[in-house]
């Protein structure tokens, strides 16, 4: 007869003993993200220079105001900042705030540009919205704002550059 000995503890058994009951777990140090229309800003680190900040937002969602069905869009935002830049996490939360809101494509696109202008007063902002196919029709909406008196520098084409 083989003498019995206790089985070694498995990683699963050890994890169960080490974990705390759900009602005794500590709250996270940073609260989880939540939708918000509050666009946070920070000082432009190079206000003396015109440069383009490009945001690619491939998963924007809102609701169709007529059917309540979700509408999806891919946004490309180009900004030439002046004194302020928009902080990306707050921009993510801002977009998230539209998730359960009903609005027409044109209204959403223009509202976002207006909110960005109000928050950072950029030299230039353009939002190109590629709304996914709905009823067999794909919609593209582009809205832009140019600060009065601002003139972009001429584009430089370099030989061999793509």
Model-derived regions, located:
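N-terminal amphipathic/basic-hydrophobic helices that include classical n-h-c signal peptides
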Residues: 1-13
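N-terminal intrinsically disordered, cationic/polar leader segments
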Residues: 12-162
């Amino acid at each position: 007869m083989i003498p019995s000995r206790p089985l070694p503890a498995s990683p699963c058994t050890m994890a169960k003993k080490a974990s705390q009951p759900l009602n005794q777990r500590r709250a996270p140090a940073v609260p989880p993200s939540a939708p918000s229309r509050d666009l946070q800003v920070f000082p432009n680190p190079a206000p003396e220079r015109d440069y383009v900040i490009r945001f690619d937002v491939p998963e924007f969602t809102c609701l169709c105001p007529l059917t309540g069905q979700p509408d999806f869009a891919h946004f490309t935002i180009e900004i030439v900042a002046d004194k302020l830049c928009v902080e990306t996490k707050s921009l993510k939360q801002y977009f998230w705030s539209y998730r359960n809101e009903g609005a027409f494509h044109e209204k959403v696109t223009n509202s976002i540009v207006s909110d960005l202008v109000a928050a950072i007063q950029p030299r230039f902002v353009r939002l190109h919205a590629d709304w996914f196919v709905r009823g067999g029709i794909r919609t593209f909406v582009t809205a832009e704002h140019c600060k009065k008196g601002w003139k972009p520098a001429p584009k430089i084409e370099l030989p061999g550059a793509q």
